[in-house]
Amino acid sequence: MDTATLQDAMQGQDVVYANLSGDMARQAESIVDAMHAVGPKRLIFISAMGIYGEVPGEKYRSILDPYRDSAALIEASDLDYTIVRPGWFTREPEGPYTLTQKGEPFEGHDISLDTLSGLIVKIATTPGLYVRNSIGVSNR
């Protein structure tokens, strides 16, 4: 991910939304560097449930390493981040959801894409909401 291209895209933006795959740690570093260079402080970063070993009955799996490593880079930054750790995606209609904080057991398993989208918009448009937090989200 080219930092200069990110800087151009971030010009004049208040919020940066990142939902990535691939070399997530490198991409997270590029995002943090670009945000420092250009000025936006607010980052909404999509990760995955289980990155802290917080899913009851599930062992941590190495497939989550890119999500955990990129979240650690974001958490070490001085940005006003929110890391969102969704459950498995469904195409169900929007509905009520449960949030869990880092260090709490993850509740539920699935999250509808409509519900997740609504939460992301709420976070992006509500100053201070879940700033410097990592939240798990699943349908009730």
Range-by-range predicted roles:
Residues 16:
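Receiver (REC) domain switch-region micro-motif
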Residues 25-27:
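Glycine-rich anion/phosphate-binding loops
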Residues 20:
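Glycine-rich, N-terminal phosphate-binding loop of Rossmann-like dinucleotide-binding domains
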Residues 30-34:
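A short acidic, amphipathic alpha-helical/loop segment
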Residues 3-7, 13, 23, 36-42, ...:
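Oxidoreductase cofactor-interface core, primarily capturing Rossmann-like NAD(P)-dependent enzymes
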